[in-house]
């Protein structure tokens, strides 16, 4: 099976996830900037973080499948596993918003981010197994340093929220900083993948 249907389905699911998240945003009661900041500020911040993450996954997913010609059943199921965890973003994002970054919602949000990262790694591994050890994707991924750093930051954030200043906001603040830092790291594109995609397009 070629990758077109899988990519189209994934794009549609990600678009729906973003739509659901933005529909969860609540307009402030007043008409001033102060009303916006105090009543909708947390919601806008959590939406922004989650939107960036969805954008990162869409971008990486798009580039990854440019290096793949066909998919099998294992790839389809691994892709569904990734979409499952990403589809929970509207729920976990809304909970963090409504709780104003309370400890348990932040921990669950971090677990969702970690699970999505693991699911992406599983998808990547299944594709490499299908394509072979010398495949373009395997060369592009290399030692996957970013993936290892990401998992470490997610775990650091989760553990910080669970153990540091349990009655205050220091632990959750560290957790959010870890999650934002991970997103910033992934916003910077991996030039190796871009080069390999261009090489594949030229060879076609």
PLM regions and their residue ranges:
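Multi-pass alpha-helical transmembrane bundle typical of ion/small-solute transporters
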Residues: 1-204
């Amino acid at each position: 099976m070629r990758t077109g249907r899988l990519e189209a389905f994934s794009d549609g699911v990600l678009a729906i996830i973003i739509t659901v998240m933005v529909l969860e945003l609540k307009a402030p009661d007043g008409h001033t900037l102060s009303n916006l900041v105090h009543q909708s500020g947390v919601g806008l911040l959590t939406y922004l973080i989650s939107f960036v993450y969805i954008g990162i996954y869409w971008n990486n997913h798009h580039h990854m499948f440019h290096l793949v010609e066909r998919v099998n059943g294992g790839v389809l199921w691994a892709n569904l596993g990734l979409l499952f965890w990403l589809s929970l973003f509207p729920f976990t994002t809304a909970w963090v918003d409504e709780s104003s970054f309370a400890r348990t919602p932040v921990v669950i949000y971090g677990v969702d981010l970690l699970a999505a990262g693991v699911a992406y790694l599983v998808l990547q591994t299944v594709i490499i197994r299908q394509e072979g050890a010398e495949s373009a994707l395997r060369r592009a991924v290399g030692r996957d340093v970013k993936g290892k750093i990401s998992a470490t930051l997610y775990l650091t954030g989760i553990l910080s929220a669970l153990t540091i200043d349990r009655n205050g906001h220091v632990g959750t603040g560290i957790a959010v900083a870890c999650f934002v830092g991970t997103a910033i790291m992934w916003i910077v594109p991996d030039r190796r993948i871009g080069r390999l995609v261009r090489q594949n397009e030229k060879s076609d």
